[in-house]
Amino acid sequence: MINIQMIGIDHSRASVEERELFSFTKTKQKELMEAVVRQQSVDGCVLLSTCNRMELYVSLDAKAEPDLYRIICHCKQISGEEEKRLRELFTVRTEEDAVRHLFLL
């Protein structure tokens, strides 16, 4: 069974300045997606990035639970207290909820 997960930050929970911390150039988008698919049990991923949101959708093996937030922070060189503080701004969706959200955008 496929497991779909989404992690994202958007205008409803984060300021422009906070969202800018997680904006990605084309090169950084590629680096992030390559880092994600290198994780064991990850089949693929898609990154959606606009001025209002950044959302990472990942297809995983059924029981896999990689820490996608840590992978994102590593690619953006965010760590320590800042990493802990910003985690609460992110939304995580799984399975049908993640797919439904994607199609409502």
Label each residue range with its predicted role:
Residues 1-105:
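N-terminal ligand-binding/catalytic initiation module
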